[in-house]
Swiss-Prot record:
Classification via InterPro entries: Erythrocruorin, Globin, Globin-like_sf, Globin/Proto, Mb-like_M
Species for this entry: Chironomus thummi piger (Midge)
Recorded GO MF terms: heme binding; metal ion binding; oxygen binding; oxygen carrier activity
Similarity comment text for this entry: Belongs to the globin family.
Keywords: Heme, Iron, Metal-binding, Oxygen transport, Signal, Transport
PROSITE patterns: GLOBIN
Protein name as it appears in the record: Globin CTT-V
Gene that this polypeptide is encoded by: CTT-V
Binding positions (heme b): H76, H111
Signal sequence, renumbered to the chain: 1-16
Alphabetical list of Pfam families matching this protein: Globin
PANTHER family associated with the record: GLOBIN-LIKE PROTEIN (PTHR47217:SF1)
UniProt KW Hydrolase keyword: no
UniProt miscellaneous comment: There are at least 12 different components in Midge globin.
Amino acid sequence: MKFFAVLTLCIIGAIAHPLTSDEANLVKSSWNQVKHNEVDILAAVFKAYPDIQAKFPQFAGKDLDSIKTSGQFATHATRIVSFLSELIALSGNEANLSAVYGLVKKLGVDHKNRGITQGQFNEFKTALISYLSSHVSWGDNVAAAWEHALENTYTVAFEVIPA
């Protein structure tokens, strides 16, 4: 029992301010508008930040227009978007905090092992927000909900990724 209490405190400490149900609903409803645009989302990230594309050995040094129509690109884009979809589906319910924490912690460890920096995570965030703001119903409330969601996510991921 003490283990679960400690785990809960660690999670709450890492995600000190979980999304409210209203924020989670805003994130979910906006995400539902684009979650099937996997290739477009990843292409937007790579176009805005070629240094991120360079971190993917299968895409490094290749012309974005030529790779974004490949099956390999679609498969990888789907992996990324599916991960985000899973996190978003779990958001807004405090009972899911430990699951979210575990997924994001693993994301941080995996990306640290690949040499991904906090700066590149922040570039991804900027590109994702830019894509979302031009492809979904967007207002200050949606922007604030996404900022809160990504801040929570990055707080956990950055526990293992050096500054």
